[in-house]
Amino acid sequence: MAKEYSRTQRIGDQMQRELAQLIRREIKDPRVGLVTITAVDVSRDVGHAKIFMTVMGQDNAEDIAQTIKVLNAAAGFLRMQLAREMKLRSVPQLHFHYDESVVRGAHLSALIERAVAQDSQHQEGPASPDAKPESTEE
């Protein structure tokens, strides 16, 4: 049985694809780096859309904030371009947000790797796992 997607999910998926291409092709501002649109969350009334994005090579919070500011300033232009590409009665207002899930995921992976390394060090300690316990019987 095929998965059922709501209308807002379908609109969000199409907006994600279109915005990725539009930003790459149309936004020539040097403050905007390599932007990846990770998700688009469209409201039920299709009036607003939260666009979650990451920027490759920009770990500095100021650079990321500047990129978001530029994209939010260009939201009207991007919305107009989306209206040309998509067959919608009204195109939602665009609100760009930084997607911190990628950074959080990398941090959690580092914590897990550190915990596994510490665990393996404790197991390799004074007693090896292959050693048999000594018998007290004579």
Swiss-Prot record:
* Presence of the UniProt keyword Disulfide bond in the record: no
* GO biological process entries: maturation of SSU-rRNA
Look up keyword Repeat and say if it applies. no
An example of a Pfam family matching this protein is RBFA
Q: Which UniProt keywords apply?
A: Cytoplasm, Ribosome biogenesis
Where it sits in the cell: the answer is:
Cytoplasm
Residue ranges that the Swiss-Prot or TrEMBL entry lists as coiled coil: none
Query: Can you provide one Gene Ontology molecular function annotated for this UniProt record?
Result: ribosomal small subunit binding
- Region annotation (Disordered) maps to 116-138
Q: Could you name the Gene Ontology cellular component terms for this entry?
A: cytosol
- Major location (coarse): cytoplasm
Subunit info?
Monomer. Binds 30S ribosomal subunits, but not 50S ribosomal subunits or 70S ribosomes.
Q: What does this protein do?
A: One of several proteins that assist in the late maturation steps of the functional core of the 30S ribosomal subunit. Associates with free 30S ribosomal subunits (but not with 30S subunits that are part of 70S ribosomes or polysomes). Required for efficient processing of 16S rRNA. May interact with the 5'-terminal helix region of 16S rRNA.
Q: Which family does it belong to?
A: Belongs to the RbfA family.
Identification of the protein by name: Ribosome-binding factor A
| Native source species | Pseudomonas syringae pv. tomato (strain ATCC BAA-871 / DC3000)
Q: Which gene encodes it?
A: rbfA
